[in-house]
């Protein structure tokens, strides 16, 4: 059995959703061959996917242009999306030719709009898995009759079934939807790299877009905290504050593996990080993303369901993190109970491929 999988290259959250489902499918049916259509770094993909796969790495969507991890560029996003949809028919034709050679039984997508017209053309099921889609995102920015909106609506309307985990946006363009439990990356047991440090510990995470700018040396004022920070391209001539420790992630040490060893995760709100905090029961200090249409829905979860506290982008940039960190660490709200949505999703997908 062959399955083609389209994964958005907008950050790591779409891969974080799809990977547990694909791993589950491989465990149930090790005979499945996967073709992944995804432009994310191969190292990141192989750190999350525990099986061999074919890959074609050209982009499968535009997503949203980020000025940095917590600030979106609406004008640049619309300009890029407008150019992309003008070539969409030609791109669909290329995808059809590619997949005819692969001969898939079905297509999965999170949440490239190319996948569903291709599935229809090949006469096979097209299944979506997502907590957001680009039609819903751009509908906040553009009129309903804009060519971007109508083109995306036409593509997504060809989806046979959309699977939606918790924390999903309202996505009315998909006619048939089914809710599933939480999809998450399971933490591996790793040695605690900061076990002997008695300070409170914060893991600073901003996903695939890297760290947004902030006043690094202001962190030394929070002397009771140790900050674990990845993606630090530090000038060797510049001294780091004594309470900042760089972290290098690899296949044997992922962000979720460190979460059980810290007191708080400081992050932008996004599905991947929030689901990992949920399952490791790690409190969340979050930075606002007011320009991104998904943010209000995620904020409802942060305000009402999680031990979490937010801060403005200005406070983050100036290094004024203390209030949010301390409030999140002692927040009385427990994380909700959860079930493994990858099991449910895999069973549904296999029922379409049989």
Region spans (language model):
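Conserved nucleotide-sugar donor-interacting segment of glycosyltransferase catalytic cores
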Residues: 94-153
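Nucleotide-sugar donor-binding patch of glycosyltransferase catalytic domains
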Residues: 248-249, 283-327
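C-terminal amphipathic helix plus adjacent low-complexity
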Residues: 322-354
